[in-house]
């Protein structure tokens, strides 16, 4: 069996692991903290961003949020970095998604925003890597529990989608 098929077959286990984590005390505290940010903050919109499959998760999440009358937009991290960063204000809740937590555009965007906003922009990072740059730079981080991945995003895509949902 090739590695790609093996990782696809591991998806149910990784979904169970991720759900188990968010049913634990630590996981519940992380989710509650994000919900508290949105409900108590003075935000006028949520902007979700990422690259590649992380951006595809952003698009799906923004669509779901708008169905619940939450003002949400998905913007590719490269577009935000180079052309559209002016849409991000202190009243924006930014959800930055990167399975590795090291996507160049996402990290560079956060560096630039940190300089421009002096850390007043609230960032929720969603990543599979707890020790990543994204996890360190985010106001709060939500962790995927997909384990190690050697091929294209399979386990991380599905667990990221679950976490953002």
Question: Residue locations for each model-derived region?
Answer:
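Cofactor-/ligand-binding subdomain signature composed of acidic, glycine-rich
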Residues: 1-41, 161-162
């Amino acid at each position: 069996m090739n590695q790609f098929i093996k990782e696809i077959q591991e998806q149910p286990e990784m979904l169970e692991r991720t759900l188990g984590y968010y049913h634990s005390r630590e996981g519940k505290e992380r989710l509650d903290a994000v919900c508290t940010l949105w409900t108590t903050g003075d935000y006028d919109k949520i902007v979700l961003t990422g690259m590649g499959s992380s951006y595809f998760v952003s698009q799906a999440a923004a669509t779901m949020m708008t169905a619940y009358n939450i003002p949400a937009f998905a913007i590719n991290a490269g577009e935000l970095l180079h052309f559209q960063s002016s849409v991000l204000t202190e009243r924006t809740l930014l959800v930055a998604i990167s399975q590795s937590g090291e996507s160049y555009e996402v990290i560079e965007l956060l560096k630039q925003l940190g300089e421009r906003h002096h850390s007043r922009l609230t960032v929720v990072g969603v990543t599979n890597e707890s020790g990543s740059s994204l996890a360190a730079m985010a106001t709060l981080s939500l962790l995927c529990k997909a384990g190690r991945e050697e091929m294209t995003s399979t386990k991380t895509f599905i667990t990221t989608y679950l976490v953002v949902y």
